[in-house]
Amino acid sequence: MTVKERITALRARMKETGIDAYLIPTDDFHGSEYVGEYFKCRKYITGFTGSAGTAVIMQDMAGLWTDGRYFIQAADQLEGTGITLFKMGEPEVPTVHEFLKKNLTQGMCLGFDGRTVSSKEASELEKMLDENGVSLSVDHDLAGDIWENRPVLSCEPVTELDIKWAGESRADKCARIRKAMEKKGADLFVLTSLDDIAWLLNIRGGDIHCCPVVLSYLVMTKTEIRLFANEKAFQTDVLEALEKDGVTLFPYDSIYEYVKTFKKDKKVLLCKKKVNSRLVSNIPADTRILDEENLTLLPKATKNPVEVENERIAHIRDGVAVTKFIYWLKKNVGRIPITELSAAEKLYEFRSEQEDFIDNSFDPIIAYGKHAAIVHYFATPETDIPLEPSGFLLADTGGHYKEGTTDITRTVVMGPTTEEEKKYFTAVLRGTLNLGAARFLHGCTGVNLDILARQPLWEMGEDFKHGTGHGVGYLLNVHEGPNSFRWKIVPGGNAVLEEGMITSDEPGYYREDGFGIRHENLMVCKKAEKTEYGQFMCFEFLTMVPFDLDGVVPELMSVRERNLLNDYHAQVYEKISPYLDEEEREWLKDATRAI
């Protein structure tokens, strides 16, 4: 079926079930950023393939909301479908909730699959729409009803993460979380975020593409831990190890019945932003719910010394692969046929040669020329273009290693570029260097520091429409909270930067139909000196790959900025050159020369 035919079929099911508007988020049953093939209902209905977006279907309209990363991509993919693009955050553009409040009136019904909407959002919708006399119907998977040949739920093998990689045993982690439960006065802890469960139990899987997680739910009490997952994914030795640490396995879907047995005198701690609305609604009404952040959130984000040291190793290995890739690109562009897709395959080949490499940490963004102006462009056979010996190639890629997860962006100068392009290339690089060199008092958040990355562009009256940085998991999700860099204050989203947090530093600049630039390093937060004013903090760059000096205008940089770049490049040469052949090493020596 075409997108138009799918929407027609969905509207027919809506009529049958008395639903006037149907909400289709991107989420799976666990609030994951990226989802398995089974859960891609929004993509199936709309044809939009971006990782973030929400669709609303009514009888007389269809709309898709997405953020600035995807404006260009969404406009292209929605063309001819009859779906209206709502550019989130733009002036005069209503939010999904504002649109629903305005367009749903007395007696109408909003429907959605309650397993794909958080309890918090469902409550907000219910309260808002109740004022209009609008009801909710949350037990229908209407998109799934019309999905022909829908993929099955993933069930990839589960493995244990050895303590030499994790740095802390499963038993010790569970003991820590139980102490936190006790402090909160909680009898039960309901955990449904897949990366949190994987972190807590020191297990990894493959149920989401490029995310080594296991489809599962978890309930912890003072005496037991129930894991709800598909038994077929677990080898006997993994099950026995889990049981030894007090973890018992139950069928994946059985949690929805289990939570109905919670007693009224018990206090249940869960995060309504993370747990889906159907699960929470199944908990007896007289059970007291403590709506708190997941107790695993901060322990997971603050990497222990073993994890940090392992990450340094992972980034050297990744740095070798990416450095070899950049050298190969510059040597061969214009001499042999290279396209965006074949370049991505070549980079995967270089990474695969590295010890302990597992997989990409996300689908690679290899964007040449005007494609680089699309912030999260993914090449397909239909969009793939050849690389030419001119302009910029933006390569935003990453890998999973047993030692951790990487995420790096380099903008490679493929040949002649304009002075204007070099001006922006240099401005973005200055932002990356200045944020990475920050020294700040403990207690600062990413909001306090974000201006360091944006200032060079703001001075030019320019900006970029995405966050400056995100947290990164340890052999887990490449996007991990709560740490981030952004200039807008988001309620509940401004975490203090703590020792051990790994965050990306990735300002950019994008000229629609022209070019795109982004420079990204990962960095770990560390303690610096302590004075009478308090504990100072700093960052250490983990990423070890040269920035392309062919795009840099030294005269546009301060002496301090040039010194920062030279010092960084000296580190890159020292750590990466031993793993290169003679020809590559000579190239790297020039690529990291002092300016």
Q: Language-model segments: which ranges?
A:
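Active-site neighborhoods and metal-handling regions in enzymes and metal-associated proteins
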Residues: 1-595
